[in-house]
Amino acid sequence: MSMQDPIADMFTRIRNGLSAEKEFVSVPFSKIKMEIANFLVNEGYIKSCSKGTTSMGHPSIEVELKYHAGAPVIEMIKRVSRPSLRIYKSHADLPKVYGGYGVAIVSTSKGLVSDRKARDLGVGGEIIGYVA
């Protein structure tokens, strides 16, 4: 059976791994998911990510989850724009997640950036998801 929304699946795997207090989570590989994983590393929400392979030989992304004092660093990770309903915003209309505490992942013409950086660059785009 094919996966309808691979990014939502990635977010769910991360959320489930955090609730089960796992150290690593394996996600099927795609370029956009690797970009999102690198974004989460740069923003400090996960420790690291690397490309690997499953036992079946399929490419995957190994995500090392991050905890602080035993609690997950990611309190909330949520998919916003989805295949059946894409959400696009201009730089002026980009939302502040948790009053600026969290970050919105925005896909722009300048690549995958945070809502703060998109506002600074003056570009809008598709809101992939929220992380806090």
UniProtKB/Swiss-Prot annotation:
Xref: InterPro entries: Ribosomal_uS8, Ribosomal_uS8_CS, Ribosomal_uS8_sf
Quaternary state and interactors: Part of the 30S ribosomal subunit. Contacts proteins S5 and S12.
HAMAP family: Ribosomal_uS8_B
Protein name: Small ribosomal subunit protein uS8
Family: Belongs to the universal ribosomal protein uS8 family.
Source lineage: Bacteria, Pseudomonadati, Pseudomonadota, Gammaproteobacteria, Thiotrichales
Alphabetically ordered keywords of this record: Ribonucleoprotein, Ribosomal protein, RNA-binding, rRNA-binding
Gene Ontology CC: ribonucleoprotein complex; ribosome
GO term, biological process aspect, one: translation
Annotated PANTHER family: 40S RIBOSOMAL PROTEIN S15A
Superkingdom field: Bacteria
Gene3D superfamilies assigned: 3.30.1370.30, 3.30.1490.10
Function: One of the primary rRNA binding proteins, it binds directly to 16S rRNA central domain where it helps coordinate assembly of the platform of the 30S subunit.
Pfam assignment, any one: Ribosomal_S8
GO molecular function: rRNA binding; structural constituent of ribosome
NCBIfam families: PRK00136.1
PROSITE patterns in the cross-refs: RIBOSOMAL_S8
